[in-house]
Amino acid sequence: MFKDKTLLITGGTGSFGNAVMERFLESDIKEIRIFSRDEKKQDDMRKLYNNDKLKFYLGDVRDLASVKNAMHGVDYVFHAAALKQVPSCEFFPLEAVKTNILGTDNVLTAAIDYGVKKVICLST
């Protein structure tokens, strides 16, 4: 099913993103794109896994242009980017809305625009 396919994982440096990446890394998938706004975690992953299937995209789901940049040529998406700590979301509700709601809308918009086959959206 994933042979010669490209997978995009938003929030790819987070706990779920790492788990999805590890699951697919040993498969016959062509490319796994890790999309996140954490440059340090991306660099750590790049060094740890040292695998040509992994491609890293620095960006933010709140920015449609950066999402579209990573989405071009993608077959499947696991959307795991989110602010998930309840105290943080309560203290910064606007940031939570921007990331969790508008960010999800950006991911879905880009996926539709680029003809992605399937998007899996996670929620906590």
Stretch-by-stretch model annotation:
Residues 55-76:
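Conserved Rossmann-fold cofactor-binding substructure of NAD(P)-dependent oxidoreductases
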Residues 36, 58, 98:
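Conserved residues in the N-terminal Rossmann fold of short-chain dehydrogenase/reductase
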Residues 76-79, 83-124:
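Conserved Rossmann-fold NAD(P)-dependent oxidoreductase catalytic core, especially the SDR/UDP-sugar
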Residues 5-27:
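N-terminal Rossmann NAD(P)H-binding glycine-rich loop of SDR-like oxidoreductase domains
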Residues 40, 62, 84:
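Adenine-nucleotide cofactor-binding loop residues
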Residues 28-41:
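Conserved glycine-rich Rossmann-like NAD(P)H-binding loop of the short-chain dehydrogenase/reductase
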Residues 44-54:
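Short, conserved SAM-binding/catalytic segment
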